[in-house]
Structures are given as structure tokens and as C-alpha cells.
């Protein structure tokens, strides 16, 4: 009994150095990043892997005349995405269908898959990728447009800042110029003030005419104004507006 226990302890002590590195390696893989964990994982032999992938492709019906490669919905044994190999005719039919209907309902999806000899899931993944590429292209176009708008606004902002700096410098150099400047205003007079202003203007004109030897007379009834010189000659007739007298 004692000899059997000694043999058991001896076998455990001999096997522990072989087990410990394996356990440590598994623990390191568990805490390693996913990409390193994938590289460190033991893989199947190359011949076995090729046989499995070929069988999987034949089962899914992915082999065909190469027109374009699209990602399939599933993943391979090694974690990489499988490529959906489409012929030129299949790609053309899918493109035409996408132009007509960017999103398919289940019935359209099943009909198109049956027409192309694909699975509905493969058609769905192709349409998802196609919509993603279209959205990416539109995003690039919008980004370029917004970039140009930003450059234009930046240039306009720079120009306005330069004008502001020039105006500030001019204000510092000659401040009295801005103090003497009066804002433009529009003068509005009431009718009574306007009559007074017209009377003053007429008085000034009559005084100037007297100084030049011109006498202004009003015809009977207030019809027109006659300007005569000092020697009695008539210079001109100036019609005036007749206002009816208010009783």
C-alpha cells in the first residue's frame, strides 16, 4: 500500500512539469487579445482544412464562374468570412434589381434567389453590402461638398476680420472724423411749417428781385405772377397755383 502511494506521488511529480506549461499557455491565450489568440490557436492540418472548406462551398453552392466576390453571411471554420463568387450575369441581375428596389421584401428576395440559384440569405447580404457602399459614396460626396463650403466660409470670415481690423485702425488714427459725422436723417415737416417755409422763401426771392431792379406783381384774380424790370419791360410770366378761399 505504501509503495503504491509512493509510486502515485512520483508519477504526479513527474507529470506536473508537463501539465503546468500547457495550463499556463491556455491561461495566456485566454487573456491575450483576440487577434493574437487567433494566431496562437492550434489549427487543423492544411489538407484537412482545404477538404472541409471545399465541402462547405459545395454544400452552400458558392462555386461559379467568377464575376465578382461578395461577403457571404456566414463564417468559415477559421473565423474568416467566406466570399460569395458571382458570375457576370448574376452581378448584372443583382445590380438591375438594386436599381429598381434597393430593399427587397421576403417574397422578392426568395424569387431573386431562386432565379440566380442562390440562397435568400446570400441575396440579403449582397443587398446590405450594396446599400452600405452606396451610402459610403454619398457620404464621401457630402463630405467633399461640406469641405468646400467650410473653405469658402473660412475665406469669407478671414476677409471680414481683415476689414474689421482696418476699420479699427482707421478709427484709432482719426477719431474726430467719426465724431463729426452725423447719421443720415430724413426731415419731415407738418403742413403749417411747410407754409411758413414757403413764405420765407418767397420773401427772400422778392428781396433779391428788388435788389436786381425786378418788380413782381400778381395779376387780377391771382392767376399768374408777372416779373417786370425797372424800365417797365416784362421779363417772364410765372403761373402759380390758385387756392380757393375758405369761408
From Swiss-Prot:
It comes from the Eukaryota. Gene3D superfamilies: Homeodomain-like. InterPro entries: HD (IPR001356), HD-ZIP_Homeobox_LZ_Class_II (IPR050762), Homeobox_CS (IPR017970), Homeodomain-like_sf (IPR009057), HTH_motif (IPR000047), Leu_zip_homeo (IPR003106). PROSITE patterns: HOMEOBOX_1 (PS00027), HOMEOBOX_2 (PS50071). Pfam families: HALZ, Homeodomain. GO terms for molecular function: DNA-binding transcription factor activity, RNA polymerase II-specific; sequence-specific DNA binding. Expressed in seedlings, roots, stems, leaf sheaths and blades and panicles. Its main location: nucleus. Transmembrane segments: none annotated. Residues 58-81 are annotated as: Disordered. CDD domains: homeodomain. It is found in: Nucleus. Residues 137-182 are annotated as: Leucine-zipper. One of its GO terms (cellular component) is nucleus. Residues 79-138 bind DNA. Keywords: DNA-binding, Homeobox, Nucleus, Transcription, Transcription regulation. PANTHER family: HOMEOBOX-LEUCINE ZIPPER PROTEIN HAT14, HOMEOBOX-LEUCINE ZIPPER PROTEIN HAT2. Probable transcription factor. Belongs to the HD-ZIP homeobox family. Class II subfamily. This is Homeobox-leucine zipper protein HOX17. It comes from Oryza sativa subsp. japonica.
Amino acid at each position: 500500500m505504501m509503495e503504491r502511494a509512493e509510486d502515485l506521488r512520483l508519477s504526479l511529480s513527474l507529470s506536473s512539469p508537463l501539465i503546468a506549461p500547457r495550463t499556463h499557455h491556455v491561461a495566456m491565450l485566454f487573456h491575450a487579445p483576440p487577434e493574437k489568440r487567433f494566431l496562437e490557436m492550434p489549427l487543423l492540418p492544411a489538407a484537412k482544412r482545404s477538404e472541409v472548406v471545399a465541402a462547405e462551398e459545395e454544400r452552400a453552392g458558392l462555386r461559379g464562374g467568377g464575376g465578382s466576390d461578395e461577403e457571404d453571411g456566414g463564417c468559415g471554420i477559421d473565423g474568416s468570412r467566406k466570399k460569395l463568387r458571382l458570375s457576370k450575369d448574376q452581378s448584372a441581375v443583382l445590380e438591375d434589381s438594386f436599381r429598381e428596389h434597393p430593399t427587397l421584401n421576403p417574397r422578392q428576395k426568395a424569387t431573386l434567389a431562386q432565379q440566380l440559384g442562390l440562397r435568400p440569405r446570400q441575396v440579403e447580404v449582397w443587398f446590405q453590402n450594396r446599400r452600405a457602399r452606396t451610402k459610403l459614396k454619398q457620404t464621401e460626396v457630402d463630405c467633399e461638398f461640406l469641405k468646400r463650403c467650410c473653405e469658402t466660409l473660412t475665406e469669407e470670415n478671414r476677409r471680414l476680420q481683415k476689414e474689421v481690423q482696418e476699420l479699427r485702425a482707421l478709427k484709432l488714427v482719426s477719431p474726430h472724423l467719426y465724431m463729426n459725422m452725423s447719421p443720415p436723417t430724413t426731415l419731415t415737416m407738418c403742413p403749417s411749417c411747410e407754409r411758413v417755409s414757403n413764405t420765407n422763401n418767397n420773401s427772400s426771392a422778392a428781396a433779391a428781385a428788388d435788389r436786381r431792379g425786378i418788380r413782381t406783381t400778381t395779376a387780377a384774380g391771382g392767376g399768374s405772377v408777372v416779373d417786370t424790370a425797372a424800365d417797365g419791360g416784362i421779363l417772364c410770366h410765372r403761373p402759380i397755383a390758385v387756392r380757393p378761399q375758405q369761408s
